[in-house]
Amino acid sequence: ILSVDDTMDSILNWYREEGMIFKGGSGAGLNLSRIRSSKELLKSGGTASGPVSFMRGADASAGTIKSGGATRRAAKMVVLDVDHPDIEEFIETKVAEEQKIRALRDAGFDMDLGGKDIISVQYQNANNSVRVSDEFMRAYEAGTEFGLKARSTGEVLETTDARKLFRKMAEAAWACADPGIQYDDTINDWHTNPETGRINASNPCSEYMSLDNSSCNLASLNLMKFLKSDGSFDAKTFGKAAEMIITAMDISICFADFPTQAITETTRAYRQLGIGYANLGALLMASGLAYDSEGGRALAGAITSLMSGITYKRSAELAAIVGPYDGFARNASAHSRVMRKHASASSSAKSVSTLDIDVWTE
């Protein structure tokens, strides 16, 4: 996760840092909301370009660089706060480009993913997400206006109908699968290090959310490997695997290289790790559970809870031996509060079948 400020030096440095990250085979996300909108003035008296225009340059760079020298292109996430004056332009950007793609395809151009003509279309190399606040959702529920604020002064430049704006997000997501929505207040309510800084953005796929200028080692366990011949889920072996993987990942931070000095310092100080699982859909199918069913959600919840509990337990055991991460002391109270939230969520979960009961009892 990177950061960018409202200066040309910072914007150009964003381009450079992303390029180095893509070269190394990783992806990056950042929040552009500090950049002045196209409705605000520059010191010189002109009008600012706005974040969407700067997205164009970053998008072109990402489309040019092969990630780690491989065949796939770079992975990007771009986030904009819902109260940014350019939010409507941000929401509609990809919709307009999708219309170009269809028109060019129908005219005979090669617009397949990776096709030779797709490079003429902009904004195709990033996932876009809107940071939605509780204040905005309250305005949506009440059917009232919502203020869009200047980045330089914080004053409300204009208001917009919250329901119409939310509708635009939904229609854009239907048309081109973007933007996604990130619920800012909820995300920061589960933040373990708020005394250090807030969470403003995520990695390209949004499974990692943490401090600006930070990174996270990611690992996934293949759930199908833990499906036993009798149809039950091997929770005990899964737990041991999660325990081993999280230990190895923590050790790897000590030996890893990072793309910038700021990311190196934050990652070494906070030691962010991300462990998850893959093949949930296959596991549910093999178990005879619909993806959108109470049984499916219960099994997924049980596995997630087990994985979270075991890995946090192992993290505490490691801290007892080598000491907590450097940033823990100033965030101890908040970290403990989030742990209690996890415990509360797990204790309030309900079992549906023997499949998830076996996992819960592990």
Where are the regions that the model predicts?
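Short, flexible micro-motifs
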Residues: 28-32, 180, 279, 284, ...
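Short helix-capping/linker segments at secondary-structure and domain boundaries
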Residues: 224-230, 285-292
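Short, contiguous, pocket-lining structural segments
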Residues: 237, 272-276, 307
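Core structural elements
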Residues: 246-252, 266-288
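Ferredoxin-type iron-sulfur electron-transfer modules in oxidoreductases and energy-metabolism complexes
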Residues: 295
